[in-house]
A protein has these predicted regions:
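Residues on the lipid-exposed face of transmembrane beta-strands in outer-membrane beta-barrel proteins
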Residues: 34-36, 50-54, 78-84, 112-120, ...
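Residues that define the transmembrane beta-barrel architecture of outer-membrane proteins
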Residues: 42-48, 72-78, 106-112, 121, ...
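Transmembrane beta-strands of outer-membrane beta-barrel pores
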Residues: 34-40, 66-72, 84, 97-103, ...
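Short glycine/proline- and aromatic-enriched beta-strand/turn motifs that initiate or cap beta-hairpins
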Residues: 19-71, 233
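Cleavable N-terminal export/targeting peptides
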Residues: 1-29, 236
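Repeated loop/turn-to-beta-strand initiation elements of outer-membrane beta-barrel proteins
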Residues: 28-30, 56-64, 86-94, 122-127, ...
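Predominantly the C-terminal beta-signal and adjacent terminal strand-loop region
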Residues: 177, 182-236
Length: 236
């Protein structure tokens, strides 16, 4: 009887432990997105996003992103993500570096973050800290002017999926104060919805939308801006 129970446990447990967890990235990916955006500061504008995901091995991946905007705002982002497979899901450490050149205001925004995250088939959560340094292009190195520094801000991200993350199509809902190119103060969350569908062996169509209120956690949830994206991903 004991041998039978042991065989039963092994038969059920080994496939579960060896199964694809359903969310890991195993292919190099190139994503190109067109974007329409409006906010109360920059008005109507369009963006072009180019993103490259590079999973060097099962334990480490890197992502590089660039965005050009008709609002004369230019973004670069790098993400480094060590990953650790757990009995259920995946634990990861994420380091992000963002650079935003705001040509219209002649200033540059540098942001860096460190976060700890966990993801499973239907949910991904990330919590961490980030710091921001802002510099004016007219700043002189020979004066007493200093950078504007925000030393510590809370970073949070919660994304819920309707299907396992390795499914040929999916729909997700996002609550966060960080997206691909910006990190907002903790009281300025972003609400988003995203979808993708695999249309061929190497091709994926992406759609997403985001809305950002103004200072929601200060009880002022008036509309600030919205973004709509559409594009494709090529999986190598």
């Amino acid at each position: 009887m004991r041998k039978f129970l042991l065989r039963l446990v092994l038969a059920a447990g080994v496939p579960l432990m060896a199964a694809n967890p359903g969310f890991g990235h195993r292919e190099y990916r190139l994503t190109v997105m067109g974007e329409y955006s409006y906010n109360n500061t920059w008005g109507h504008h369009g963006n072009l996003d180019i993103q490259a995901l590079m999973p060097f091995n099962p334990y480490f991946e890197m992502e590089a992103k660039a965005q050009l905007s008709t609002a004369s705002v230019y973004n670069l982002a790098l993400q480094f993500r060590p990953k650790f497979t757990m009995p259920v899901g995946e634990l990861f450490i994420e380091t992000d570096v963002y650079v935003r050149a705001i040509a219209r205001n002649q200033m540059t925004d540098y942001t860096a973050s460190l976060g700890l995250g966990y993801r499973m088939d239907y949910v991904s959560v990330n919590l961490g800290l980030f710091t921001r340094v802002m510099s004016d292009w007219q700043r002189s190195w020979y004066t007493d002017e200093t950078f504007v520094v925000e030393p510590f801000n809370l970073l949070y991200r919660l994304e819920v999926f309707c299907r396992p993350q390795n499914n040929p199509w999916n729909l997700s809902f996002l609550f966060s104060n960080v997206d691909d190119y910006q990190m907002e103060r903790m009281w300025q969350p972003l609400f988003g919805i995203g979808a993708y569908v695999d249309v061929a062996d190497h091709w994926r169509i992406n759609l997403s939308a985001q809305c950002k209120p103004t200072g929601m956690f200060h009880l002022d949830a008036t509309f600030y801006g919205a973004t709509f994206r559409a594009g494709f991903t090529y999986l190598f």
